[in-house]
Each structure stands twice: as structure tokens, then as C-alpha cells.
Amino acid sequence: MEKEKVDELPPNDNWYETALPKPPVPSLEATLDRYLEYAAVVAVGQKASLATTHDAAHKFVRQATPLQEQLLEIAEKSPNWATKFWLPEMYMRVRMPTPVNSNPGYIFPKVKFETKEDHIKYTALLTRGLLEYKNLIDTKQVCREKSTGAQKLQMCMEQYDRVLSCYREPGVGEDTQIRKQKTNDGNEHVLVMCRNQTFLLHSRINGALVSYADVEYQLAQIEEISKINQNNTANIGASGVGPRDNAALFWQDMLTVEQNSKSYEWVKSALFVVCLDMEDPIDYGKNDTMSISEKEKEFVARGYSTLTGHGSSKFGLNRWYDATIQLVVSSSGVNGLCIEHSTAEGIVIINMAETAIRYAQKYFKSKMVWNDVRNVHPKSLTWHFSENSRNILKKQAEVFDELANELELEVLIFNEFGKDSIKNWRVSPDGFIQLIMQLAHYKTHGHLVSTYESASVRRFGAGRVDNIRANTQEALEWVTAMASKKESKERKLELFKKAVLKQVKVTLENISGYGVDNHLCALFCLAREREETTGEDIPSLFLDPLWSEVMRFPLSTSQVTTSLDIPDCYLTYGAVVRDGYGCPYNIQPDRVIFAPTAFRSDPRTDLQHFKKSLAGAMRDVKELLSN
């Protein structure tokens, strides 16, 4: 490992040699038709009248025509009109804390560490794996991705360039996504958090990646230094755990001190963050001897550790939540990523993470030999705090602890069937699981709600996502029939097939750039801007009481399928509204892993019931489709 080199291959220009098309702008009429379909389903659950909604819709085409014309002009001049509006509304202007509310956790397979040296070694291997992947990105040696559909269209690779080169800087009213500039000296570094202290780990010097041995040596040095200074820390990591405006005010105060400004620049320019959590080892047992229920509990414990660090009293402040990638590695063997989501989607991060995991697993049991003399040393960052900044840190930590305590996480490892059986039933696995979640919500609450499932629009330049809404009229008719003892199996099967076809149609609309959410978001933003600048009336559709209910998501879902050679992985995140559920899922050939979440104190949710309903819905549909 001492002499290991990364191949410095020439850049592969085919990432950008073929210009991708701009996304289309859907027609007002098509978007309005789809919106009314979803509004009708939500209205049933709300027991609300659609009269005012239909009246507002009747006026909408006339009222929104100037907005549509303005949007068409923007689309002509902008690389991607959708991302221009979507990114600020989805992330940058949201004032809630990013932990739980926004930042997902990607849980890696647990590792058994016999010694502290094992912990440092595995962390160094994961770190080095990420650094090597960064090198592949820089030299464009990551193969350009293509869509999974029949056409195999080229996908935008911009997110790969951004994932380790962006930072979310808090601002009053709106955050800023900073693109880090490459330095002329060829030096790069990683931020390391250990015992709530901040350190720089040098990762590239004069253009050359430092050796694995130097990464491990620096981590060991950081652990030793942090132990000596552990009673002299002010918990700087608390800066990003609370409301975004408070985070911005904290840094406004801090940056009046020159030393703080220098340290902050080091932080913002770091490639990613490594969080070394030093705790007593926890014996979760061996995975192969666990029952399913024991394994689910172990998955849950790992999820809490990765998402929140179990709050400020444990490891929740040994984090830097404004960074895109936080690699969390605990001495208990728990490890994974905590992700600031505004920069990139899951598939990009999974591809990077799985490369690092394979690298670490390959070399972890190997005996490392290197020279005793090491010339690369980490750097400890210095901070000076005013009374005001200390008070803000304290308040941020209090908000964070409430969030961490409120997060309720469950894991369902459903191992009765998986992707293989679903394909044998001639159903899209993702569409199948989307309908399963509709049925589970109906079983739990007796109605459907607006549902979020991201659809990649990376076939367009600078494309991110739109929203596949699974709460269609066809889905409502099917789940209603499934709950009825009067409906025949044949009728239920007929309605299921209709719901599947509609799900496929809506999915195709979204990935082709004709979804409704990005379009409505842009129109709403333009209307709000006109009202603020000219006093022009906002279209009545945006003032309709049902609008806010249709545009919030009590069921937020995401497919995160991981590779077969890396088992025991899953992704999780908090619900996006207080009375809702988060429900990411991992579809494997013989099983499906669900990771539903909710907020403990909200009486409108029942996570245990919802988990049971997911399993029940899976069995119900298997029975429906089995001959």
C-alpha cells in the first residue's frame, strides 16, 4: 500500500462532447389537467369540495398565460429552466434545520473492529476510496451513464463534477450553493471531525494524492490530539444543526474575527468531511445468526447513528451538516454517509460510496507495511467565540436535540419476495412498490395523500429531478377496491393493472420532461415575483385552500437500490412534513427493505401501523397476482 499509485489517465471528454437537450416546457393545459387529477384524490382524503378548485382552474389558463410566456423566454436563455426554480424552492430557501428534515443517511455494512487501530485503518481506507473516486471524476474516467429505458439516452454527468466540489453556505432568507474552485498549487484536503473538534487532513499535495499510509497516519494523529483537547471544545459543529437563519447569523458574528475567516475558508474548501465517532464498541451480534426482527432493530440503531449521531450529548455535534458528504465511522463499527442533498441525487452518491466500500473491504484484512517516518501532518483549526456566538450554538443544539428525539425510524426487511417475483408478474418493480405504499397508507389512514417519488431528468443538461405522484385516481380506485369485501378478485386485479399502467404513464411523462411539479413550481415563483415587484395579482389557483395540500407531501418516498455484493445497506431520511412519513426502499432480487420514518409526537401518524401495513400490502398483492 505504501507505493500504491493512482493512474493519472488523460481526461475523457465524452462526458460533455455531446450537448444534451434543454428540458421542454409543458403546456398550461396539460399541467392543469394532471393537477386537477391529483387534487381530486387529495380532496377525497380531506373531505373537501372541489368547487373552488375547479373555478380557479377555469381562470388559470388566462391568468397564467403571461407567466407561461415569461417562462418560455427564460427556458430559451437558461441551460435548464426547471433547476433554476427547483433548487431554491426545494432546498436553498427552506429555513428548517437540514438534519432529519433534509439530509438523508446512507447506512453502510457494519464492520467489527477489534482495536482502535482497526477503526482508524478502516476509516482511512474509506477515505482513500473516496479520494480515488474523486480522481476518477477529475480525469473523467467514470463512464458516462445512460438511461435504463429502451432508448439508452446519455445522461448529464454534471452532478459527478459537483458532488465533491460544492458547499451549502447558510444565508439569511436563502442559502448559497458554493462551487469550490481548484487551487493553483494542486493541494486538496478533507475536514475531519473528532470529539467535536475540527482538523484538516491533507489529501493531495502539489498535485499528487497522498499515500494511504499518510491518510491513516493523519487520522491517528487527529484522534490523539482530539483526546488531549477534548475538554476545550465549543462544539462548532452545532452551527449547522438548527434553523438556517440562525446558522447564517452565527457565521456573520464569527467572521468578524480574521482567524475564524481563515478557518472557515478551510472548511468550505474541503472535499468532504470524515466524522470519527469514538465510542464504546456495541455488540449487535453476528448478522447471520440474527432473526429478522433483531436485524431490523440493528438496522434502526445504525440509522439513528448516521442521521443524528444520537443528539448533542453523544455524536450529533461531531458533524458538519453543511458539507455535501459526511463520512461517519464509529468505533462501534457503524459507518455510512450523511448527505446534504442539494448538490446531487442518490444514484451518483451510491456509485461513489460503493466504490469506496469495495476498496475498504478489499484491503481491510491486509497487513499494511510502510516506513516509520511520515512527513504529512494534519492541521488543527482554531476558532474564537463571542458570547453571542456561543449563545447561538447553544440554541442550535437545543433545536437539534428536539429533532433527534422526535425522529422515529423503523426498518422492514420483507424477505418473502423481491424484484425477481415482481418482474415475473410483468410489473415494473418501482411502480409495484409505489402502489404498495399507496395501499399501505390507505390501510393505515383510510385515504391517499400527495406522494413524492423523485424521477431523474438527467437526460437534459443540468437536469435534476421531477416528481412522480403515485396518488393517481386509478390508484385510489384500486386501494378502495382492495379494502372492500364486496369486490371480486378479478375486479381488484383489473383495477391494479389500470393503476400500474397509469403509474408507467406518469413516470414516462416525468422522465421526458413533462411532469407537473417543476412546471407549477416555476409558475408559482414567477407569480410571487410579479406580486412583489409590480403588485400583480397571484392566479387564484395558487390561493385555493387545496393548493397547499396538493403541494405538500405526507408520503415522501425514494427508491435507493444498492449492489448485490454490498449487503445490509439502506438509505433513510425524515418525513418532510410533521404529519407525514418518509419511506425510502431498497429493492433486491429476493427482498425489499423499507425504512419508514415519522415524528414521534404527532398524533396524526402511526409508524408501527404503517410498517405492518407495508408488509400486509406486499402479501395482499402477492396473493392477488399469484395464480
UniProtKB/Swiss-Prot annotation:
Presence of the UniProt keyword NAD in the record: no
Catalytic activity: choline + acetyl-CoA = acetylcholine + CoA
Gene name of this polypeptide: cha-1
SUPFAM superfamilies: CoA-dependent acyltransferases
InterPro entries: Carn_acyl_trans, CAT-like_dom_sf, Cho/carn_acyl_trans, Cho/carn_acyl_trans_2
Enzyme Commission code(s) on record: 2.3.1.6
Its job: Catalyzes the reversible synthesis of acetylcholine (ACh) from acetyl CoA and choline at cholinergic synapses. Required in SIA sublateral cholinergic motor neurons for a left-right turning behavior that occurs during the lethargus phase of the normal sleep process called 'flipping'. During 'flipping' animals rotate 180 degrees about their longitudinal axis.
Chain positions covered by the region annotation Disordered: 1-20
CC terms in the record's Gene Ontology section: cytoplasm; cytosol; excitatory synapse; neuron projection; neuronal cell body; organelle membrane; plasma membrane; synapse
UniProt keyword terms in alphabetical order: Acyltransferase, Neurotransmitter biosynthesis, Transferase
Biological process, per Gene Ontology: acetylcholine biosynthetic process; neuromuscular synaptic transmission
The name this protein goes by in its record: Choline O-acetyltransferase
Active-site residue list: H341 (proton acceptor)
Knockout-associated phenotype: RNAi-mediated knockdown in SIA sublateral motor neurons results in abnormal sleep behavior whereby larvae display a defect in 'flipping,' which is a left-right turning behavior that occurs during sleep.
Family membership: Belongs to the carnitine/choline acetyltransferase family.
Keyword Cytoplasm (UniProt): no
Binding site for CoA: 418-430, 456, 559
One MF term in the entry's GO annotations: choline O-acetyltransferase activity
Tissues of expression: Expressed in SIA, SIB and SMB sublateral motor neurons.
